[in-house]
Amino acid sequence: MSEQATARAIIREAGTSYAAQAGFTLTDKPSQLYRLLVLSVLLSTRIKAEIAVSAARELGAFPTARRMREATWQQRVDALGRGSYVRYDESTATALGNGADLLLDKYGGDLRKLRKEAGGDVRRIKELLREVPNLGPVGIDIFCREAQAVWPELRPYFDKKALSGAEKAGLPKDAGRLAELVDAADYARFSAALVRLTLEKGLLEEIKAPA
């Protein structure tokens, strides 16, 4: 199987984004970008991805920074609990409220204004994202991996986990060379799929198994 064929197979079988798993389609709109940010915050902690995704679905009841700020702390805790995100529910509920305050005060609740302030500089986007409470390095990578679908200046975004997945699949461990294997429109799904190869035991073998 050629590298391009391998890449296509990986996307086809494992290229579901976290956003899609959480039940929303990412677009360059304030609500969807905010939901991606919340999802990235939830994935920043040492917790199973499926639990974070489940909690993000429940928090979809508060799809904007304003709605999140208007929700009571207990409403946030309850939503996290329904998603089984119970280990960090209280601290995360507080962080989400503080994060909503930050986004509303600094960007009017619109992450596109953060993008504009960064002026197309990926490093600056990541610096500004670091200001969001509880959004750690892992969460920032997740946000950028997925947001590259709608923010072209992030492309190609293949972080260390994605590159590790590429190496496991026998593909180049280089972002530029990986980008040559698929269309730019597929970078986000390709990156998500490569990360999944590092997390799900036996997935690569299933993908490479003869039909």
Question: What are these model-derived regions, one by one?
Answer:
Residues L36-T45, N98, R189-E200:
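Short, hydrophobic/amphipathic alpha-helical patches that form generic packing surfaces
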Residues P30-F62:
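Extended cationic-aromatic binding surfaces that line active-site or macromolecule-binding grooves
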Residues S44-S54, L102-G109, A149-W151, L199-E206:
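Short helix-capping/linker segments at secondary-structure and domain boundaries
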Residues E131-P137:
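A structural motif
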Residues M1-T25, V122-R124, P137-A211:
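C-terminal accessory module of base-excision DNA glycosylases/AP lyases that mediates lesion recognition
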Residues F24-L36, R46-I47, V86-S91, L181-R189:
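Structural motif
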Residues A61-E131:
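Alpha-helical ds-nucleic-acid-binding substructure associated with the helix-hairpin-helix region
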